[in-house]
Amino acid sequence: MTNIRKSHPLIKIINNSFIDLPAPSNISSWWNFGSLLGICLGLQIITGLFLAMHYTSDTATAFNSVTHICRDVNYGWILRYLHANGASMFFICLYLHVGRGLYYGSYIYSETWNIGIILLFTVMATAFMGYVLPWGQMSFWGATVITNLLSAIPYIGTELVQWIWGGFSVDKATLTRFFAFHFLLPFIISAMVMVHLLFLHETGSNNPTGIPSNMDMIPFHPYYTIKDILGLLIMLTVLLALVLFSPDLLGDPDNYIPANPLNTPPHIKPEWYFLFAYAILRSIPNKLGGVLALVLSILILAIIPLLHTSKQRSMTFRPMSQCLFWLLTANLLTLTWIGGQPVEQPYIIIGQLASILYFTTILILLPLFSTLENHLLKW
């Protein structure tokens, strides 16, 4: 009799994806972040669902409903802070996952990579709309500033912004539709994750050497399930430490002030995970140029497979490319810092230099150094 795990139409899919899946024997902890992202998504959907049971998407009551969740709902405070800080964990895992893909050449699997980029954009859109829902000062002004960027689009910009707002300013209609989309998008993300995994399992996983590992595979369970559980425990420890000891560490104090269209906060800035893109946006004096740079700062990932000039897939044995990769990492951290600073010298010039360096490193230096390494190795 065949094992039900291998014969049942539904269980068979789970078996081939998570149990009997052949995996390279040498993948490191950098390959943990995919499963951590899945867990983050599940956690966000569950906590979000319970929060939605008590939240009201009306400008008059939204702020008070969040206060009510924290004060009156049983364990509402932990749900709210798990959801808010869970988003931060989500983005930490997301950026590390993308960084891993860049370092080890995972972008060679172009379908998986491209679905991943679409996922990144969708998660960013979801997080942005979620930040608007508590209807604090930073929620309101963040929504106003970021949606207003679309007015830079020639001809249709102004109409497009008013269409998104549902009126002539960010108001009740905007909040209601943002709540609707914020609720809907995670389920669309879940479906896209399945497509992401479908394409990944067509080719199999990459590994740190960048060399095909078809002749040395091991079953995913128990080897990588136990490894993923360790990653999960570490992530949960960090998340719970954040939620229980310092839940507002990554938030903005201005968001504890109810939204007031008549009073602009001194420094409008998004959540920390968008600061690098915000710094790139601010570093260009022209509005349309800034918006284009903002979009391209993420969309540039789509052309990375075309810029791969090295004869080796991974950066493991390419010290010059490694130096550039860590320069890029330091550069992104610099941009994140600049995005949170006021628009004054020396922050303006540092932001402009870091933005130029970001695009130069990816578009010119990485392909150039890869070609140079090929010549040095006489390939």
UniProtKB/Swiss-Prot annotation:
Presence of keyword Amino-acid biosynthesis: no
Annotated positions binding heme b b562: H83, H182
Q: Which family does it belong to?
A: Belongs to the cytochrome b family.
Record keyword Nuclease present: no
Q: Where does heme b b566 bind?
A: H97, H196
Give the note.
Heme 1 (or BL or b562) is low-potential and absorbs at about 562 nm, and heme 2 (or BH or b566) is high-potential and absorbs at about 566 nm.
Q: Which residues form a coiled coil?
A: none
How is the cofactor bound, in the record's words? Binds 2 heme b groups non-covalently.
The topology of this chain with respect to the membrane is: Multi-pass membrane protein
**What is the organism field in this record?**
Cistugo seabrae (Angolan wing-gland bat)
Oligomeric state and partners? Answer: The cytochrome bc1 complex contains 11 subunits: 3 respiratory subunits (MT-CYB, CYC1 and UQCRFS1), 2 core proteins (UQCRC1 and UQCRC2) and 6 low-molecular weight proteins (UQCRH/QCR6, UQCRB/QCR7, UQCRQ/QCR8, UQCR10/QCR9, UQCR11/QCR10 and a cleavage product of UQCRFS1). This cytochrome bc1 complex then forms a dimer.
Outline what the protein does. Component of the ubiquinol-cytochrome c reductase complex (complex III or cytochrome b-c1 complex) that is part of the mitochondrial respiratory chain. The b-c1 complex mediates electron transfer from ubiquinol to cytochrome c. Contributes to the generation of a proton gradient across the mitochondrial membrane that is then used for ATP synthesis.
Q: What name has this protein been given in UniProt?
A: Cytochrome b
| Binding site residues for a ubiquinone | H201
Cofactors: heme b
Q: Which UniProt keywords are listed?
A: Electron transport, Heme, Iron, Membrane, Metal-binding, Mitochondrion, Mitochondrion inner membrane, Respiratory chain, Transmembrane, Transmembrane helix, Transport, Ubiquinone
Tell me the InterPro entries matching this sequence.
Cyt_b/b6_C, Cyt_b/b6_C_sf, Cyt_b/b6_N, Cytb/b6-like_sf, Cytochrome_b, Cytochrome_b_C_euk/bac, Cytochrome_b_N_euk/bac, Di-haem_cyt_TM
Q: Which GO terms describe its molecular function?
A: metal ion binding; ubiquinol-cytochrome-c reductase activity
Subcellular location per UniProt equals: Mitochondrion inner membrane
Q: Name one GO biological process term.
A: mitochondrial electron transport, ubiquinol to cytochrome c
Q: Name one GO cellular component term.
A: mitochondrial inner membrane
